[in-house]
Design a protein with these regions (language model features):
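Basic, polar low-complexity surface loops/patches
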Residues: 1-168
């Protein structure tokens, strides 16, 4: 609820063989939108993580509940922030990640009480997104998923990379 990130660590060496402090590595980072523990999640409520991307063509929005696998992608051809705010209200995500182009993070936090985590625009590069998604889904292109718009790729790619980084 507070928006914290929690690092999960494990010992990586046998304490009997260690000289001094036992070596530990971070194996996973849990954020509000990547919680999978049913004891922590509210029963009957989805736990969405949302990714927002803005460029000159408009907005891309990717929403996922990692506990159920639900994944929805949409885009808006104009730059009307109210449509994005409607998407946020519709899903009420636990966490929002976005690119530098999203300049209304303070408004999102004020209206919905959800903090945004901002990533550099290069994290949303179209070519990287296309390659990453095709590799992930083991396809030559993404037309079979109904994804053929550049603005959507950046969102999906960032979400997949973010999810891989946090959840392994």
């Amino acid at each position: 609820e507070k928006g914290y990130k929690v690092a999960i660590c494990e010992q990586t060496e046998d304490p009997k063989k260690a000289k001094g402090i036992v070596k530990r590595d971070v194996i996973r980072i849990v954020t509000p939108g990547t919680v999978l523990d049913t004891n922590i999640l509210d029963e009957g409520r989805n736990n969405y993580i949302m990714c927002l991307f803005k460029n000159v063509d408009g907005f891309g929005v990717a929403t996922c509940d990692v506990s159920t696998g639900e994944f929805v992608v949409t885009s808006f051809e104009d730059t009307a922030e109210n449509k994005v705010m409607d998407e946020i209200a519709k899903y009420m995500p636990s966490e929002i990640i976005c690119n530098d182009g999203i300049d209304f993070g303070d408004q999102i936090e004020r209206v919905f009480g959800i903090k945004t985590a901002t990533y550099n625009d290069w994290s949303f590069d179209y070519q990287n997104a296309n390659i990453c998604l095709c590799n992930h889904f083991k396809t030559l292109n993404l037309c079979g998923f109904g994804i053929d718009d550049d603005s959507r790729y950046g969102n999906d790619w960032l979400f997949l990379c973010f999810h891989r980084k946090l959840c392994g």
